[in-house]
């Protein structure tokens, strides 16, 4: 029997270790262990993470301009310029990401210290802002927490952690009330009560929404509160490069993060007592995704390089209904991300047809259009492959025009912009990468195996979603875990101190300006080509339906592509400590793609979002989360922290 050990943790007994291959050769080495087998009692999700891995403790408001020194109600924020001109900023809390999880957490911890919110683009540019459907919560007397729990567990193919599900479904209603108290405005019915929608996989109406722009309204309300808070400082256009960690015996400790300003190219170091990763998902490992352009897996990759435990990366959710541009009367120019057609369209009675206007969902599942997302996405994929077509049709035109326009104004406007009236014509739709159900493994308070590092939102794997996320549970999970991470973070801050000499503990990343514009442009151009190649490999071999032979092909081709890209960089004068936004995004995409493929290869069954023709059935013995343990034997540039020892 093999034994896997997470950094700083006790032993976990496995039936077998699983390997990630070395990116610089054919010889496999133990890069990480992936747990699938063993008894359920040996790896109870909540107790394992919360105990064994417990750490010691609309329009948007204009973003405030961040200067060198600021004042807050708690005194001066320290900002130091080093002799080489580099800048270090000191905070009690650093939050990476400005979506619902990061902002909600920041507003709470700001009552106890200074907070830096680091965001890659503009503050509102997050997956939250693109969320259409809503937030699920038990707010109707006819509904129950038990019913919400059961729907979540069934949708998750019985891989969910029951305690996590109970916590989220129980605490969700209060988190919604807090949002409303903060100024978020949701739709109400004629009776004055919240208008609750129903979506696929839900047995009751429990979706709180703001038309089909729920995320935008939540983001607006949270940003408004954040910009009014003197203890919160938002750093827009700051791209997080790597977490700053040290090894203390068997423990790994996080001290902050290195960033690069995406416009000035200045490298800025943030030192803090607590860091929250709330950086979103990894949709752009695929060519078509509903995620914003910032979703390149930065948080998951940084955490993996920092020796955090990663889990369930094989479960990539493809939303069944993204707008198929080629089916529109007026085909738009290329989009950076696919336009989502919310689950609520099917929840309100939308019907799926093939291009011959034949309804097909009842052939696949008795719940038809209201089946969970994994079922609907696979059904559409099957139709497209059998019929040789590129999209299917989602029809809501049989519903009253006024109802359609009031419930889905954003979708109606987008389609009309390209010549399609959804009140009279069906909508062309196709599956697109949408949500990562895996991520950085977290306990019930958002804690990780890295001291001082907490996670919330899509970057985290809490056990809520299991093998497939239930519609509208993502914003709910983010709210609940952002709030649950607050008290342990405060406790950690209260027993920690900032060492103002810490800035010199790690070598500084450097912008590659010395390469010159000509070489730099070549590197950027090649990186963009490689990015498209990686996305093509992932869609072709690691898509909705998989097989071991195709996954092995993907693993080999990704390994070769990564080696070729890194060799190209270093042959053109790139150094291991150099950083550029596109290069750093590329290393993160490679890191996450490798995690997805290795996790998929280790699961010998079909469950939820992971469907493989080699193991087409659910196996009870495989009903365990996949766990990737940290390893220090990472030889590729993409898999190493920049401040780690140089590549040999």
Swiss-Prot record:
Task of the protein: Involved in the biosynthesis of pyridine alkaloid natural products, leading mainly to the production of anabasine, anatabine, nicotine and nornicotine, effective deterrents against herbivores with antiparasitic and pesticide properties (neurotoxins); nornicotine serves as the precursor in the synthesis of the carcinogen compound N'-nitrosonornicotine (NNN). Catalyzes the oxidation of L-aspartate to iminoaspartate.
Reaction catalysed by this enzyme: L-aspartate + O2 = iminosuccinate + H2O2
NCBIfam families to which the protein is assigned, alphabetical: nadB
Positions bound to FAD: 98-101, 120, 127-134, 298, 458, 474-475
UniProt key word Chloroplast: yes
Matching Pfam families: FAD_binding_2, Succ_DH_flav_C
Molecular function terms from GO: L-aspartate oxidase activity
Tree of life domain: Eukaryota
Cofactor: FAD
Active site: 373 (proton donor/acceptor)
Gene deletion effect: Reduced alkaloids and nicotin levels associated with a lower putrescine production. Occasionally, an early senescence and a lower viability of the older leaves is observed.
Location relative to the cell: Plastid, Chloroplast
Keywords noted in UniProt: Alkaloid metabolism, Chloroplast, FAD, Flavoprotein, Oxidoreductase, Plastid, Pyridine nucleotide biosynthesis, Transit peptide
Protein name in the entry: L-aspartate oxidase 2-b, chloroplastic
Any single Gene Ontology cellular-component annotation: chloroplast
Sites annotated Important in orienting the L-aspartate substrate: 199
């Amino acid at each position: 029997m093999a034994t896997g050990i997470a950094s700083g943790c006790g032993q976990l007994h496995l039936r077998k270790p699983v390997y990630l291959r070395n990116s610089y050769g054919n010889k496999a080495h133990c890069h990480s262990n992936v747990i699938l087998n063993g008894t359920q009692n040996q790896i109870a999700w909540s107790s394992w993470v919360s105990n064994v891995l417990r750490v010691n403790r609309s329009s948007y408001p204009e973003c405030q301009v961040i200067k060198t020194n600021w004042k807050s109600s708690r005194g001066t924020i320290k900002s130091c310029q080093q002799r080489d001109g580099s800048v270090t900023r000191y905070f009690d809390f650093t939050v990476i990401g400005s979506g619902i999880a990061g902002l909600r957490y920041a507003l709470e911890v700001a009552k106890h210290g200074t907070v830096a919110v680091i965001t890659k683009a503009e503050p509102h540019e997050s997956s939250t802002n693109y969320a259409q459907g809503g937030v699920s919560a038990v707010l109707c007397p006819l509904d129950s927490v038990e019913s919400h729990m059961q729907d979540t567990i069934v949708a998750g193919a019985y891989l969910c952690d029951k305690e996590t599900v109970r916590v989220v479904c129980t605490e969700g209603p209060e988190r919604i009330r807090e949002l409303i108290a903060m100024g978020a405005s949701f739709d109400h019915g004629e009776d004055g009560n919240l208008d609750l929608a129903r979506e696929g996989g839900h047995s009751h109406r429990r979706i709180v929404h703001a038309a089909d722009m729920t995320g935008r309204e939540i983001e607006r309300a949270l940003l408004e509160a954040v910009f009014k808070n003197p203890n919160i400082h938002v750093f827009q256009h700051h791209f997080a490069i790597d977490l700053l960690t040290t090894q203390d015996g068997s423990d790994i400790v996080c001290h902050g993060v290195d960033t690069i300003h995406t416009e000035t190219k200045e490298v800025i170091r943030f030192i803090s007592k607590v860091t929250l990763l709330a950086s979103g998902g990894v949709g752009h490992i695929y060519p078509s995704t509903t995620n914003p352009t910032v979703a390149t897996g930065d948080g998951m990759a940084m955490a993996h390089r920092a020796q955090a435990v990663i889990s369930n990366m094989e479960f990539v959710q493809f939303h069944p209904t993204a707008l198929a541009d080629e089916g529109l009367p007026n085909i738009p120019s290329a989009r950076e991300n696919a336009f989502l057609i919310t689950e609520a369209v099917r929840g309100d009675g939308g019907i799926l047809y093939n291009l011959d206007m034949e309804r097909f969902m009842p052939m696949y599942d008795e719940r038809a259009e209201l089946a969970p997302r994994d079922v609907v996405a696979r059904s559409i994929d099957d139709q497209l492959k059998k019929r040789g077509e590129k999209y299917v049709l989602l029809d809501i035109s049989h519903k009253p025009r006024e109802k359609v326009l009031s419930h889905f104004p954003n979708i109606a406007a987008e389609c009309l912009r390209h010549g399609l009236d959804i009140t009279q014509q069906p909508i062309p739709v196709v599956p697109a990468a949408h949500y990562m159900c895996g991520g950085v493994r977290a306990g019930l308070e958002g804690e990780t195996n890295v001291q001082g590092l907490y996670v919330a939102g899509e970057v985290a794997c809490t056990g809520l979603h299991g093998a497939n996320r239930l519609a509208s549970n993502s914003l709910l999970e983010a709210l609940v875990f952002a709030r649950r991470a607050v008290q342990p973070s405060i406790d950690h801050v209260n027993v920690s101190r900032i060492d103002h000499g810490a800035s010199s503990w790690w070598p500084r990343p450097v912008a590659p300006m010395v390469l010159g514009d000509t070489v730099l442009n070549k590197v950027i151009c090649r990186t963009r080509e490689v990015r498209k190649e990686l996305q093509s490999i992932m869609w072709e071999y690691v898509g909705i339906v998989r097989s071991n032979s195709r996954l092995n092909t993907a693993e080999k081709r990704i390994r070769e592509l990564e080696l070729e890209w890194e060799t190209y960089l270093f042959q053109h004068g790139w150094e291991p400590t150099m950083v550029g936004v596109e290069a750093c995004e590329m290393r993160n995409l490679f890191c996450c793609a490798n995690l997805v493929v290795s996790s998929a290869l280790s699961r010998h069954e079909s469950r939820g979002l992971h469907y493989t023709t080699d193991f087409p059935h659910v196996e009870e013995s495989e009903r365990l989360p996949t766990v990737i343990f940290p390893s220090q034997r990472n030889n590729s540039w993409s898999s190493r922290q920049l401040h780690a020892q140089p590549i040999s």
